[in-house]
Amino acid sequence: IAGVQGSFDDTDEVERIVENAMTGIAGIRGILVVSGGQAGVGRAFEKLNIQDRPYVIIYDQTPKNERALKSNVVDFLIDQNGYVQGYRPPHILADLLLKGREPEREFWFTDINIKTKYNL
């Protein structure tokens, strides 16, 4: 691990971080972006004219991220089923507070899917 950087969901900041890492740290084989601003990775690669780029992993299956995957800007996309994760907890809480209804079970597990351009 070369380091952990905060980008504040800012594309320009992600671009700067990737540029600095690629020019200042030898042997980078992978980049994981867990925030917004993933487009900064591709912009940094273009600016640096990188031919043999590291593997890139990003989060959230959005149309924009699917395009990045299909166009070989990134290699892997981790989908956490954000709709279910964002919908179910407030629904459970509302049922508990407004209706006094306990959740059906203690834990609700959601899927995590790893996508490549071949299984989109």
Predicted features and spans:
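Hydrophobic alpha-helical
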Residues: 6-63
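Flexible loop/hinge segments that line or gate small-molecule binding clefts
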Residues: 62-74
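Short, surface-exposed amphipathic charged segments that create phosphate/polyanion-binding patches used
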Residues: 18-19, 71-73, 92-95
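Hinge/cleft segment of the Venus flytrap/periplasmic-binding protein
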Residues: 81-120
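Hydrophobic residues at beta-strand termini and immediately following loops
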Residues: 4-5, 78
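Conserved active-site and cofactor/substrate-binding residues in soluble primary-metabolism enzymes
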Residues: 36, 64, 84-88
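Short beta-strand elements at the ligand-binding edges of bilobed clamshell
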Residues: 71-83
